[in-house]
């Protein structure tokens, strides 16, 4: 499939022509009244569940989702994860105000290729009118499979304006936002939530039921409160309770660092789908591994060094083809490189070199040097080099959890 258009290009005439067509025909946007029907089997294993049908195409009984992550789940990474087994991907979270004002930085993040489908577009905001208008524009111009509302972001800048998890302090507002988005699109409207604003207001079942009552077609739960941010453990028991309390599909999210975690979440909670965020960093093959476990097959081994480097370079070339600024793209890609080399011998030294690159050619050169001179790298490690015990910290200040993205780890 061809890659999506480079960033920085204009919307062109598509929006105006679709809007004109709507005015001419008097088209009225209505919420789709029924879900598409899919045949769903029980999960292989000791525990069986009756799965809820999703309102958009999914290829497996228990779909695997790539979480929306600011600065990470851009089109190239979404495409890569789809190739490695993700059933559904979601855009970075996007401001409804930015969309309706056609801010080019925001609009550029809405672009996706045909090979990314099934895809959802995630929007956030506390102004129902802005959310409705943004949903209408996204539907007309970009036509994803569904629109997701962000009620999970704990970022101060977002919640200060009552967006993201800030909405959870007012369930009437949550319902108003959901109904407004539904009024702006014929696509399924889904939500991503946290367990509440604070421990005192913690009630994920009440929140999920309110979302369902307003018309949400799917709910994804990250079982932490906003005040928890990323501390403590995600309370998977709350996913199970929400799953029992509502009649729409429930996606589990939070603390999935490995394929085994994804399998364990499904077993413990009965969730209809599993959403992976940080667990995909530097290992997009986690989806193939999780799929094998969910289907009762032996989990494939993680790629060796050479294959891992090949996947990283494939990712780099996809980014290079997508971004308009090659040097800026290479610098932005440094964080991914740090994740790809995590755990390798002398990975701290390797990461240090990779975090200084200014071009994708430099990346290939460093990888080639590592593969040709492994004995030297290992000797350097013996002389004091270390593995990558600190790679997780490399995300600090680099990747924001603007959709509950890092919260979905």
Feature locations, PLM:
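Alpha/beta catalytic cores of nucleotide-metabolism and tRNA/nucleoside-modifying enzymes
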Residues: 47-65, 70, 75-76, 184-186, ...
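Hydrophobic faces of well-ordered beta-strands that scaffold small-molecule active sites
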Residues: 64-68, 89-91, 119-123, 147, ...
